[in-house]
Amino acid sequence: MEAHQFIKAPGITTAIEQAALAAANSALANAVVVRPFLSRVQTEILINLMQPRQLVFRPEVLWNHPIQRVIHNELEQYCRARAGRCLEVGAHPRSINDNPNVLHRCFLRPVGRDVQRWYSAPTRGPAANCRRSALRGLPPVDRTYCFDGFSRCAFAAETGVALYSLHDLWPADVAEAMARHGMTRLYAALHLPPEVLLPPGTYHTTSYLLIHDGNRAVVTYEGDTSAGYNHDVSILRAWIRTTKIVGDHPLVIERVRAIGCHFVLLLTAAPEPSPMPYVPYPRSTEVYVRSIFGPGGSPSLFPSACSTKSTFHAVPVHIWDXLMLFGATLXDQAFCCSRLMTYLRGISYKVTVGALVANEGWNASEDALTAVITAAYLTICHQRYLRTQAISKGMRRLEVEHAQKFITRLYSWLFEKSGRDYIPGRQLQFYAQCRRWLSAGFHLXPRXLVFDESVPCRCRTFLKKVAGKFCCFMRWLGQECTCFLEPAEGLVGDQGHDNEAYEGSEVDPAEPAHLDVSGTYAVHGHQLEALYRALNVPHDIAARASRLTATVELVASPDRLECRTVLGNKTFRTTVVDGAHLEANGPEEYVLSFDASRQSMGAGSHSLTYELTPAGLQVKISSNGLDCTATFPPGGAPSAAPGEVAAFCSALYRYNRFTQRHSLTGGLWLHPEGLLGIFPPFSPGHIWESANPFCGEGTLYTRTWSTSGFSSDFSPPEAAAPASAAAPGLPYPTPPVSDIWVLPPPSEESHVDAASVPSVPEPAGLTSPIVLTPPPPPPPVRKPATSPPPRTRRLLYTYPDGAKVYAGSLXESDCDWLVNASNPGHRPGGGLCHAFYQRFPEAFYSTEFIMREGLAAYTLTPRPIIHAVAPDYRVEQNPKRLEAAYRETCSRRGTAAYPLLGSGIYQVPVSLSFDAWERNHRPGDELYLTEPAAAWFEANKPAQPALTITEDTARTANLALEIDAATEVGRACAGCTISPGIVHYQFTAGVPGSGKSRSIQQGDVDVVVVPTRELRNSWRRRGFAAFTPHTAARVTIGRRVVIDEAPSLPPHLLLLHMQRASSVHLLGDPNQIPAIDFEHAGLVPAIRPELAPTSWWHVTHRCPADVCELIRGAYPKIQTTSRVLRSLFWNEPAIGQKLVFTQAAKAANPGAITVHEAQGATFTETTIIATADARGLIQSSRAHAIVALTRHTEKCVILDAPGLLREVGISDVIVNNFFLAGGEVGHHRPSVIPRGNPDQNLGTLQAFPPSCQISAYHQLAEELGHRPAPVAAVLPPCPELEQGLLYMPQELTVSDSVLVFELTDIVHCRMAAPSQRKAVLSTLVGRYGRRTKLYEAAHSDVRESLARFIPTIGPVRATTCELYELVEAMVEKGQDGSAVLELDLCNRDVSRITFFQKDCNKFTTGETIAHGKVGQGISAWSKTFCALFGPWFRAIEKEILALLPPNIFYGDAYEESVFAAAVSGAGSCMVFENDFSEFDSTQNNFSLGLECVVMEECGMPQWLIRLYHLVRSAWILQAPKESLKGFWKKHSGEPGTLLWNTVWNMAIIAHCYEFRDFRVAAFKGDDSVVLCSDYRQXRNAAALIAGCGLKLKVDYRPIGLYAGVVVAPGLGTLPDVVRFAGRLSEKNWGPGPERAEQLRLAVCDFLRGLTNVAQVCVDVVSRVYGVSPGLVHNLIGMLQTIADGKAHFTENIKPVLDLTNSIIQRVE
């Protein structure tokens, strides 16, 4: 069907009409939808106010303030679209959930009418939290809102929106509030009626009524059911008049939108506000006429809002203009007051002629009429007087001028002014008027009002300047200035007039002088309990922290704070500076914002301010929306117990590490001083000064903690040599030799006892060891180091993180810690544990253990040792315990030397212990293997892939380097060469946003090479030494190099850096844009290396879910942690970073970057702009589209005007059509019915051995009477075309033979040739060209009968669950959704129905050739309509299944065992079968109407029902070369074929038959079965059967057939072996082995159903078909032969019998 054939546009005759039609269509397409019900007057008012915008009225809601709310919604849409992610001032509670783009909302505590608004606010979503806080007076639960008001809130936001919420704030206050927020733009919607400029009174206008009592103005619009606006008059006047704010917070106020007297003001922070004069009311329709007597009292007995009448009256402009024109042009004899009154009465009547308004009229009060008559009469009198006097005096003047002589004229010419200063008439000075005189006029026209007022902000700068000037003036007079204007106390220049450096200065204004906060303060944990709750710290940690105290030494310097926190026996240092990076336990980054002048700091959702008070340092903390205030007294705090401190630090570290492992977002890493410091929870620049290398800093799990070597104050058993200097360029010096304690040989055991701290100072000739944290503690005394014994260890492998594997003795390690293979009790044992005890017996004193981590114990006596406990594999194999044994040794600073834990006495396999160490160690650790373990490692050590650089590759690469070196960009490559050889590398590949770059740590790399400047800047911001490929040629020699986006680097530069580096780690995505040959010299593809990823990362932290699904073809294993489900939007306004594909598009879009430049970058929002010149690029390189789609984290707008991305399968049409059809986001139960394989409880199938295929089919042919057919198919005569219009090709040549690959030459199905052109014509005409018998009747009776099976259906909603099932089905079929188009019925592809012939013929026990019936076809609807109707039909089907009685079975939506049990329970019943002939072809307008009735019951949108009726009632079937235009019928390829065929089948059976002892019924399409004891035809059946032309064939027998199974009451359902074997005989098992394998698997599935019922099936199936049981037995054996893959095939070439003669079309 092509719906466009029923849509016809009217003819357009001229270009003017065409332009007018285009303009009208455009106006309607962009019209404002008005949803409320409106009166006629309200409609006229709204049309006039909204001009020139087109309005579309779709009334569906009742509003209290319809006119204002429509205007409000329009202005709100404009403001939110321009503001983007912003802060909102005074949001309406009902708008909170609808606008997730708002960062923060400022509210005031509700009073009066606001309380009612909060009570009616939504109780779900973000609004619920706000509602709870507002009504219960609770503090905010997060940072997304506050109740401090706009003026007192300090949430940082660049853009703001205020919708009718600034009427109580002066412009100067708003300027200061914006400065406090750091806001540069604020979109404010305000209602500013011009009547507030007038004196108090009651003003009636055409739109609203305004009551002005001098202080407040109340505005009520036409039709309002409750009070309208009520605002302060003086503030409204200020907003009308002000165009700029000057002072410390300058603003420019611009009116960017206006609807009536509703304005959108754009307040922009500008350093020098320029003049911005504006006319606020250029379209005002009223003139305000002043009453000459002024206002009088109100005669009412009841109090009113305004007790006086108006001074001014609003008069329509057309009334006043018409009255002035009439009165000013009357003759002197005709002019009088009564004539004016008569004329005014006439023009005040509204006159309409048909639909044309000839006179608009005016409905005025008596006061207004009196004032207008008086003002008009006096104004005209004054004008007449001027006219008379001007003519009279002018004539006299002319007489004087004409009477002048030559001398007088010469004098006038010489001495009187002329030229530019001459204005005719000025020299006469007829009449001088004053502003307050009556002659100055009686009316005010708002159209002519112009405002440009500047207001100073309310800061004290102006007063300070005045004070300075006044004091200087007094001092100049020699007086002592002691006036009230002297500087306020506590300000710089507090010395008053004596400070000449400040007084009178305009350059250095007075600033608040903050007192020096340096000093020592005591911190008690119980003061910060509110903060611990805000941080969601576990209760045990909070309880421990509350019991502890700390002493903090604070040193303040300009823009810097140094803190030294002493907690028990531990000391921590932090440095607070602006821009410091805070450590985190998740992927988020936190940068500290510190302002010393404001004494504040903040990061993320945490902020604090501090102030020195007499009681101490007062700190106000805001964390996660909750506030905490603490005052830390000066002086020291009592020292905490070391055990308590150690337990607190240990628990805090475990909490941080647990959060880091399991949280997707994480938060601040909470150091001990972050919970017990004066600036919690911040601890920037955390450095530990303690002597205990405890608490796990720098472990494998903490990316941000110190990874330097550990320094301690314990005394070594041996003296050490002088410390070595730190390596240049490294953040921390490496541990010197003097700080390394080794296991002494047994001969030196006597020195172990001397491990006490000496008290003598260090000799002057020795260099003290390097200490990492200033100020350094006093170093211990070191003795001169003796020469170490020769080492015999052998290096086996080095990991990229610096960890090493050695073969040798643990005693040769230089690591800070030694790991002992201990037992759970940490008692001296055997093996390595015994060796440790011999050398370090003190290490086993449990009282000296400083920390326990799990089963591991840490000690510093006599040196750092960790006792680790591995599982005993002799008792139980416990891999988790083995992992934990290594993991528990990582809670330390410095490096550690390990043995293979458990591989000795505990008999843990070497491979398992090694793998556990490999997964749980820290950078720089060492593993020592015994010789047997080393042999295992040599055979299994990890190998890095190798890249072989051949001589040809090196020669070509060097040529490319020479070409590069000659350019300006590549001059750094001069002299660089690549030599042949082998390069080992590590290549981490991953999906976009998988964190490849973030996984690199600064300690792992020296140089980072990146392809673009954008990436270089990103790496440098993270603190890495990053270079572009050419510049990096100078710095990569011998360095550890990481190459980001390696596949996109020029290959010659990639090879150069890989060969020069000491170790190379490649990062990238092989599916993204490869290196581009900009020179087009052909060198790039010639030398591009084949890089093999060593690891693939499949989890993306950037890409939303919809992007992952789009790119899943390139990344089959991609997963995402993003919570954004839908991020791609089409044809919306551009946002964020613009991405283009070509340089031409980049030049046309300022600020855009190409996708090649964007590789590796991450943006919150992006806009992809596809231009026509990128068609070849996108079609040839899908990588460009992948890069563009994977750059954003939240939202991406696609502007695809040429449709390039749609051509590669990137479109949102499916989702748009789904929501257009009324779909909703929600969940239904899935439609998949869980099915399991039958258990072999009987296994009777095993009694049937495989049998001969040929004999089984011969026996089947004998039993059914079928013989070998001489032909492959029969083309029956084509029936007469009874209705519709057939389009057929001129050429109808057909092939006369068919090649088939089959099991037997005897076919047991009807013979047809689906691929023949004449067969297609016969099916088209015979099935869909037959006359449809229409039946006009009500559907109520049939629907009532259908209720026996399907009760009345309630409202149904199509949800995203059904949409997902639709998409899942499309994906399973290999479809990408590109065939789903926008719902445009003028497009033929949207509504096309494609027809093709079925290739499966029907099994029959009768004659296979002489049936003379046409074939069967499939009419596939377009994918657009399938996606449009499919979710609705699936949702309706689910609802029907939920309502069906348990004994009614629908389609395949049931478990087979349940149906079998129901049949088994009906042992005394007979089987009622009904067979329809031409079921689809006989469906007509009545069946279609019944479908529409059911759809209406389900709440389907009416337009969707009408569209379905249109598509079903008139259609065009499009075959490959033929097409048929027809009406009605049913098409088997519709999205609701099974649903509506089954419903129609149920309706016919329920309406036409009545059953006795009804037990079970099953319906599937046109197939049905009912188990009952008797049946009869209903009394209303004949009318329906005859009216619809139904062809029913009823069979009533003990055993029946239904949907491929045999229904045997009392036994159950059994597979139909005869039918299945007969259909196999017709199948073509060729031409390739794939088809044969598919059919073999189908046979296996069928046999699985025979597992337990094979013997019963032999007896029952043979009775149904009247064949011998032996046949069924042989057929089962034959199927087992086929399932075993031993089938025998015959290849036959058979002719096709053509019985067609001509196509006969009936002439109407």
Curated annotation (Swiss-Prot):
Span list, region X-domain: 800-957
Any one Gene Ontology BP term: proteolysis
Protein name per its UniProtKB record: Non-structural polyprotein pORF1
Domain (+)RNA virus helicase ATP-binding: 949-1097
Alphabetized GO MF terms: ATP binding; cysteine-type peptidase activity; helicase activity; metal ion binding; mRNA methyltransferase activity; RNA binding; RNA-directed RNA polymerase activity
Entry keyword set: ATP-binding, Disulfide bond, Helicase, Host cytoplasm, Hydrolase, Magnesium, Metal-binding, Methyltransferase, Nucleotide-binding, Nucleotidyltransferase, Protease, RNA-binding, RNA-directed RNA polymerase, Thiol protease, Transferase, Viral RNA replication, Zinc
Region (Zinc-binding): 510-691
Region span, Hinge: 714-793
Record's compositionally biased regions (Pro residues): 772-790
